[in-house]
Amino acid sequence: MKKLLLLLFVGFTMSCSNNDVVVTFDDENSNAIRTHFQNYLNNDMDGLKELWSPDIKVYLNSKQAISLDDFVGLLEAQHAGFDPILMTFGEEGGEDLGVWVQTITYPAIGEYPSSTLTQSWFDWNATGKVSGKTIVLPAHIGFKWGEDGKIIEEYHNYDTQEMMAELALSQEME
């Protein structure tokens, strides 16, 4: 019985071994996303476009992708409706770390090729130009990289209710 338990333990331990997933924080892709976010904060749409593949698929809380033109229009509307816009990360009362960014490279598994994704977490803080109300949205954005070093898929996950309400106010005032 002891030998059987030992065999099961060794088998379990071996099955939990490293599967070649690599997580980095200060790599080329993570740093490119930090620059990408600075371009967003500076309302530099041309700078943002430099990192996007022309065929990028952008998903905003949905499995249905929106067009790059629609996405750029939304980003421009954010800057028209809010000032300032900040991206922060950290414990309340602690040091602001900016945006938390990490890149994960997954090995090929079965029919799936290897892939590299950069994940980011932050609080999107913005003050509405019309209402003067400051909103804080916890956000997660994931970026999938193509072989050419461009972003081919972008996944946005956050509650947009307050943001969209403020943008609607902005449009009513026009």
Regions found by a protein language model. Name each.
Residues 16-174:
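C-terminal and inter-domain tail/linker signature
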Residues 4-13:
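Sec-dependent N-terminal signal peptides
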